[in-house]
């Protein structure tokens, strides 16, 4: 038996030596050989292979088991193409206000995403589960016409602005001037008004296999907004399986600005399956309570002892139907969380036990809106003909605090000429 064990040990050492030599060579080859000799590889693909080779060599150096090394090497592959059903580009060819709409497909890591220039919307996002099976985890429609003439949720997957969330009574006073905005939500302004950034065609300044840069100018006077707001927004799928959003905005007149993205997720990949079994963690010890119309009172209250507290990961459905004034006002979860910490950091994690999919949310913002899909009613169908059910999609929107322009004690959202608004958000996917 001792001889057999010795032979197995020698075999393991040989296998590890071979694997180490191979991946060390691959790392050397990828980093040394000029990229011009391999034009079929994108920058993102080179970066991804560098990252994976470094990870694999590190695992070998730490004498990880060979199956771990093999699993890491297999992660170089994305979802099999026969697992992904891409939407038709033709179905997203349209025209709004004289501007053509189009559909774009991005790849990065194990992710595949499709976005349309109408509202800079995320239309689909494919990600693998713990067994490597891919599913579309983003709720959306199958054509641009359905987004233009939506019969359900207007904001699916869209860029939101000039100010995301609600402004009380659609009005504010800045520098002595009163501004009145359109009242599109129970006597208040929601997500910019009737014609926010979600209802316009964005220009595409550049696009490649893994990234797209959108550009828009929201004109002064549009629905009462005072300044020309110029926005650049980049979507990137990274080699380490993140959907990253980078915002940059300027204005020629002082105005509040708070941009966000309104993607809806179901990590099971099914728009008719409840998200109440998803488990959620949010790094926030306070919230801004709201009234029956979801307008902040101006207070900042502790989450200690509240069913809104997600500082310990728990199933979304555990407390959602508790008797609580805030849950009653929101019809479930639909609240701003005052994020702990500052700078670019992880602020939330969403886990779906059945598939093993895990989504970590990173941002440099001070707020996160958690919405549990309380207003979906199953009457509208998604891109696959599946009813979008009640509490079957979740939104985690990084943001400034709602109605901040009307609450001096909230973090400032005013952007002035000469200043630059920036905002980073990333949804990073993995499994466990």
Predicted regions and their residues:
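Extreme N-terminal basic, low-complexity initiation segments
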Residues: 2-10
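Basic polycationic patches enriched in arginine
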Residues: 8, 27, 35-36
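Short hydrophobic targeting helices and cationic amphipathic motifs
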Residues: 13-16, 23, 29, 41, ...
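Short, positively charged and aromatic/hydrophobic N-terminal segments
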Residues: 24, 31, 48-55, 60
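Bacterial N-terminal signal peptides that target proteins for export
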Residues: 62-67
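Bacterial N-terminal signal peptides
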Residues: 69-77
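An exposed, glycine/acidic-rich loop-and-rim segment of catalytic or binding clefts
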Residues: 80-432
């Amino acid at each position: 038996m001792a001889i057999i064990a010795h032979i197995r040990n020698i075999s393991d050492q040989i296998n590890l030596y071979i694997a180490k030599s191979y991946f060390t060579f691959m790392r050397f080859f990828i980093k040394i050989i000029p990229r011009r000799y391999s034009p079929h590889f994108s920058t993102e693909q080179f970066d991804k292979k560098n990252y994976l080779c470094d990870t694999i060599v590190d695992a070998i150096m730490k004498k990880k088991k060979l199956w771990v090394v093999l699993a890491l090497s297999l992660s170089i592959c994305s979802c099999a193409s026969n697992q992904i059903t891409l939407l038709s580009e033709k179905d997203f060819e349209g025209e709004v206000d004289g501007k053509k709409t189009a559909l774009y497909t991005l790849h990065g890591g194990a992710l595949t995403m499709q976005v349309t220039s109408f509202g800079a919307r995320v239309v689909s996002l494919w990600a693998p589960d713990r067994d490597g099976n891919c599913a579309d985890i983003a709720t959306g429609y199958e054509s641009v016409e359905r987004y233009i003439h939506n019969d359900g949720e207007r904001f699916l997957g869209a860029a939101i602005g000039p100010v995301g969330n609600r402004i009380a009574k659609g009005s504010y006073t800045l520098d002595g001037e009163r501004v009145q905005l359109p009242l599109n939500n129970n006597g208040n302004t929601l997500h910019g008004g009737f014609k926010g950034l979600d209802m316009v065609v964005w220009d595409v300044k550049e696009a490649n296999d893994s990234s797209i840069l959108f550009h828009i100018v929201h004109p002064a006077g549009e629905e009462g907004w005072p300044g020309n707001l110029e926005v650049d927004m980049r979507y990137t799928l990274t080699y380490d399986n993140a959907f990253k959003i980078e915002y940059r905005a300027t204005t020629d007149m002082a105005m509040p600005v708070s941009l966000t993205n309104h993607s809806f997720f179901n990590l099971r990949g099914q728009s008719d399956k409840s998200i109440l079994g998803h488990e959620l963690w949010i790094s926030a010890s306070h919230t801004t309570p709201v009234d029956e119309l979801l307008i902040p009172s101006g207070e900042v209250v502790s989450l200690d002892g509240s069913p809104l507290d997600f500082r310990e990961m728990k199933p979304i459905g555990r407390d959602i139907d508790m008797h609580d004034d805030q849950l009653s006002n929101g019809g479930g979860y639909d609240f701003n969380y005052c994020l702990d910490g500052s700078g670019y950091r992880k602020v939330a994690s969403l886990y779906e036990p059945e598939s093993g999919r895990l989504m970590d949310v990173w941002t440099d913002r001070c707020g996160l809106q958690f919405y549990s899909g309380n207003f979906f009613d199953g009457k509208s169908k998604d891109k696959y003909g599946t009813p979008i059910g009640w509490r079957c999609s979740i939104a985690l929107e990084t943001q400034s605090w709602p109605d901040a322009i009307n609450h001096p004690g909230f973090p400032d959202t005013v952007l002035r000429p000469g200043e630059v608004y920036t905002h980073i958000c990333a949804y990073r996917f993995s499994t466990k």
